Amino acid sequence: MLQIGDIVVSFDVLREKFLCNLEACKGECCIEGDAGAPVELEEVEKLEEVLPAIWNELSSEARAVIDAQGVVYTDEEGDLVTSIVNNKDCVFTCYDEKGCCYCAIEKAYREGKTDFYKPVSCHLYPIRIGDYGPYKAVNYHRWDVCKAAVLLGQKEDVPVYKFLKEPLIRKFGEDWYAELEVAAEEMKKQ
């Protein structure tokens, strides 16, 4: 583990390779799992604010879930997560004509309809952030649905931290990310 300030980073974030391959996985990370995506408390209001911009993109089932329970719920572990449809799809998922799943919030952001990109936990995947008292832990999460992303990352030689540069800066800031890059370069020399 590597420590930068009060943030502890798994060496896997620096060593392992990853590059999303949406053509291969079809956005399965937004579908599979036993709960929705982790959400920070301050993101709930943003999720509610973006609803008018994405409402027509959402499935009727997703709209019904949102009407019944809201955009988030507390899962079995006590974490705030996005609401899900039929214990599977995130309520913010949409599908294109090829059956590929994508995030309606990110689509609205790219179209200039909102200034909210999507929950930071989604943006950071396959990194998961854990809280341990005064420290945050940055860990690489391995999941079978991302095998194609691992293979593409290996082929293109893209480490997890480089693939996730933008969301890591969004979460921890540019100075922190610059320190992470220095640490990664030093680690390569060893």
Residue ranges of model-derived segments:
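Short loop/turn segments that flank or connect secondary-structure elements
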Residues: 1-190
